[in-house]
Amino acid sequence: MKPELRIDILKDITSKVDVPLVLHGGSSNKDEEIAAAVDNGICKINISSDIKVAFYTQCRKTLNENPGYREPLEIYPEAMEACGKVVEEKIRLFKSNDKVKYYY
């Protein structure tokens, strides 16, 4: 069962509190729902599972294509690249691509 965000409830919460809101378990939500959540007060989104899925999916693919691989340096580079792509997509989805200026 896929998660479904209740943006109507989020709007109600946002109108009543003045604190940054966190979406725990943001993995597997539709991009449209995540974008709407960001537009309605969500400031932090936990997406560890989305990153892990990209990692282990690519590890499996690499190992299936190269059954003789045993060394992490043979297996992990493409998996790490897959993780990076997910992170880049999520940064844009969360409208956080301009936030680095606050940290450097």
Language model segments and positions:
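Alpha-helix-loop-beta-strand connector modules within alpha/beta enzyme cores
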Residues: 2-23
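Alpha-helical scaffolding segments of alpha/beta enzyme cores, especially the outer helices
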Residues: 8-12, 36, 85, 89
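Active-site mouth loops of central-metabolism enzymes
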Residues: 22-24, 76-77
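Active-site beta-loop-alpha junctions enriched in small/polar residues
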Residues: 24-28, 48-50
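Catalytic cores of alpha/beta
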Residues: 26-42
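Short active-site-adjacent structural elements
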Residues: 30-33, 53-58, 62
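Glycine-rich phosphate-binding active-site loops on the catalytic face of alpha/beta enzymes
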Residues: 40-56
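Extended, intrinsically disordered, low-complexity segments
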Residues: 62-104
